[in-house]
Regions:
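GG-anchored amphipathic helix commonly corresponding to the ABC/SMC/Rad50 NBD signature/C-loop
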Residues: 5, 15-35
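Walker B catalytic acidic pair
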Residues: 38-39
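Short pre-catalytic strand/loop immediately N-terminal to key active-site residues, enriched for Gly-Thr
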Residues: 3-9
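Short, glycine-/Ser/Thr-/acidic-enriched flexible segments
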Residues: 25, 42, 89
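C-terminal lobe/lid and adjacent interdomain/linker elements of RecA-like ASCE P-loop ATPase modules
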Residues: 47-136
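Conserved D-loop-proximal element of ABC-family nucleotide-binding domains
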Residues: 29-30, 42-50
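Metal-dependent catalytic core segments for phosphate chemistry
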Residues: 12
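Conserved helix-loop functional segments at active or binding sites
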Residues: 24-28, 46, 58
Length: 136
């Protein structure tokens, strides 16, 4: 098959990961102060998500990184965790953004990993996950 432009054959997630790889290589020379990645982890395994999270953490040492994710492997790597929620109020959709403290963050990581019924074991796992990420 004839080669085609990457923009025509790659998925949104693949394009995001290609961008991540490029940004990781040129971050020191890049004049962009903030990098935004929207669900860069779509369609990847937990292990791949962890590797992406580590790369984003490395980039964040030089640049501000904003990343939307639905995976705990990515969320635990953040220095700051913002929770974005959409709610219906009457006939309107209202979006709220709030910064999570450590306990709220632990709960959110547990929720991402296991759903709405959070157990003490899930919270312990989330706490350990956060500690492990701090050491990476």
């Amino acid at each position: 098959e004839e080669p085609k432009p990457i923009a025509k054959i790659a998925s949104g997630g693949e394009l995001s990961r290609i961008m991540l790889a490029l940004k990781n290589v040129i971050a020191e020379k890049d004049s962009i102060g903030t990098l935004i990645f929207d669900e860069i982890d779509t369609g990847v395994s937990g292990r791949a998500a962890q590797k992406i999270g580590i790369k984003l953490k490395q980039i964040s040492r030089l640049r501000q990184v904003l990343c939307v994710t639905h995976l705990a492997q990515m969320a635990v790597m953040a220095d700051n965790h913002l929770l974005i929620e959409k709610n219906i109020q009457g006939d309107r959709t209202v979006t709220t953004v709030r910064t999570l403290d450590h306990e709220q963050r632990k709960y959110e990581i547990a929720r991402i990993m296991g759903g709405e019924n959070i157990t003490e074991l899930m919270l312990e796992n989330a706490e350990q996950y956060l500690k492990d990420a701090d050491n990476m």
